[in-house]
């Protein structure tokens, strides 16, 4: 047998196998192919590249052929927008616009939607921005506008607080003008913390740490909004050294009348009810109803659950305990402030500011509107996403226009208790406790004989 003849010969009863001494070592990187039609040693076959789409009727890839084109996968939006969400948002925005053109009771009803419209639209844009870049940038632009509006509000209140005529048209001198401009500048500078997350997410070199830790655009926007507005609401108190609304009331006896206008006590109570309706409508949209959640999921996200008899009894007991804690807390805070000689909240000015609510009907309305509205907005929307501490700081800052630091300290501690109640139970229970707490405080403030 020729030692160089490596072919396999057919015999009548099978294949004849060469002797081991006659078999040459195959070259490296080659595979053996036993066939009568092909050489015995071939290069390894070329594996076809992975395809991003099924090949379908594409012929098999042969050596020397160019690979088929690679198609990018189609992007499918998972956040589908429900028509009900569109109807609710358009209705809210339409009411806000029409409120500029209508007066009377109907106009007051429409004007009550302004606050809810701003924050609801911001939240909806944040949800849409999860998969739509235009909505993400629109949400950050809208946040910039909201903080700018808050800065001008602070400027106006500060102007009323330092004006020499009590109406804000004139100021006494350069010092007062400098104070007002400082309030405006520092309030607008509160926008910087809100934009820092957006800058980190820009194409200028981000590490996507927020996404890795679960910090989606929605949570970043909620964080920026809460921090910026918390600082902005406190800015007049920090710079002026006193709450701007109380300072304006002390300078002008007409200020309280100007705030109520021609609405009267009954009109103010109706305005609170109007605002509550719009807040509840905005809340269900702000947590993604019609985008990420259905009705049941929305109520669960807000913590609004059916109250049982047992939970109702627990809420009443917690209300009584919170009232007792409030009395001890106010006593301790007042003595601490007096010991250090710090300025406290003017009780007479507070009573004059809220005198329109010092009736049994006013106590009921405030208990319902403040309890339900604030709990849904703060403990229902913000707390599950940002936690108790940060959401409670925002809740406390909302009262900085009329309360001094001693009263804000009391509000902060009360808010912490309500936040713990919300965490251990639900928003329904915390709303009952909050409403009952405010109801009793208003009843206790009603002058004797009324």
Cite the ranges covered by each PLM segment.
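Alpha-helical transmembrane segments of polytopic membrane proteins
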Residues: 107-121, 171-190, 267-280
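Juxtamembrane helix-loop-helix connectors linking adjacent transmembrane helices
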Residues: 172-174, 206-278, 287-369
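Low-complexity, Pro/Ser/Thr/Gly/Ala-rich intrinsically disordered linkers and tails that serve as
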Residues: 11-24, 29-31, 35, 52, ...
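Hydrophobic alpha-helical transmembrane segments and adjacent interfacial helices
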Residues: 93-99, 144-160, 225-238
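Transmembrane helix-loop-helix hairpins at the membrane interface
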Residues: 2, 33, 37, 42-44, ...
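Canonical alpha-helical transmembrane segments
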Residues: 118-136
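Membrane-water interface of transmembrane alpha-helices
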Residues: 183-205, 284-295
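Membrane-interfacial loop-to-transmembrane alpha-helix junctions, especially the N-terminal start
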Residues: 80-86, 134-144
């Amino acid at each position: 047998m020729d030692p160089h003849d490596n072919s396999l010969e057919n015999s009548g009863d099978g294949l004849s196998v060469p002797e081991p001494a006659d078999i040459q070592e195959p070259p490296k990187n080659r595979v053996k192919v036993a066939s009568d039609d092909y050489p015995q040693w071939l290069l390894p076959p070329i594996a076809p590249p992975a395809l991003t789409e099924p090949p379908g009727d594409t012929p098999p890839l042969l050596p020397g052929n160019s690979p088929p084109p690679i198609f990018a996968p189609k992007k499918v939006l998972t956040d589908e927008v429900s028509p009900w969400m569109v109807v609710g948002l358009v209705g809210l925005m339409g009411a806000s616009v029409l409120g500029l053109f209508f007066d009377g009771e109907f106009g007051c009803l429409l004007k009550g939607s302004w606050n809810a419209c701003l924050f609801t639209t911001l939240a909806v844009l944040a949800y849409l921005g999860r998969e739509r870049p235009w909505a993400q940038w629109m949400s950050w632009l809208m946040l910039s506008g909201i903080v700018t509006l808050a800065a001008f509000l602070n400027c106006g209140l500060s102007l009323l607080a330092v004006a020499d005529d009590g109406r804000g048209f004139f100021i006494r001198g350069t010092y007062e003008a400098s104070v007002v401009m400082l309030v405006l500048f520092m309030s607008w500078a509160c926008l910087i913390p809100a934009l820092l997350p957006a800058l980190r997410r820009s194409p200028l070199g981000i590490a996507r740490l927020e996404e890795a830790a679960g910090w989606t655009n929605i949570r970043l926007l909620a964080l920026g909004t809460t921090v910026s507005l918390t600082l902005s609401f406190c800015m007049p108190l920090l710079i002026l050294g006193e709450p701007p609304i109380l300072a304006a009331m002390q300078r002008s006896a007409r200020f309280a009348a100007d705030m109520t206008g021609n609405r009267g006590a009954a009109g103010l109570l109706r305005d609170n009810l109007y605002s509550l309706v719009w807040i509840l409508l905005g809340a269900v949209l702000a947590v993604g109803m019609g985008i990420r959640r259905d009705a049941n999921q929305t109520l669960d996200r807000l913590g609004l659950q059916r109250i049982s008899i047992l939970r109702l009894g627990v809420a009443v007991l917690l209300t009584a305990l919170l009232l007792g804690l409030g009395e001890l807390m106010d006593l301790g805070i007042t003595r601490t402030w007096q010991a250090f000689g710090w300025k406290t909240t003017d009780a007479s000015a507070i009573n004059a500011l809220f005198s329109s609510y010092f009736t049994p009907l006013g106590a009921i309305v405030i208990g319902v509107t403040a309890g339900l509205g604030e709990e849904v907005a703060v403990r229902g929307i913000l707390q599950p996403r940002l936690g108790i501490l940060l959401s409670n700081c925002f809740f406390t800052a909302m009262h900085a226009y009329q309360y001094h630091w001693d009263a804000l300290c009391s509000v902060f501690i009360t808010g912490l208790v309500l936040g713990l109640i919300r965490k251990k139970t639900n928003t329904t229970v915390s709303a009952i406790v909050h409403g009952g707490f405010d109801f009793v405080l208003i009843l206790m403030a009603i002058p004797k004989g009324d």
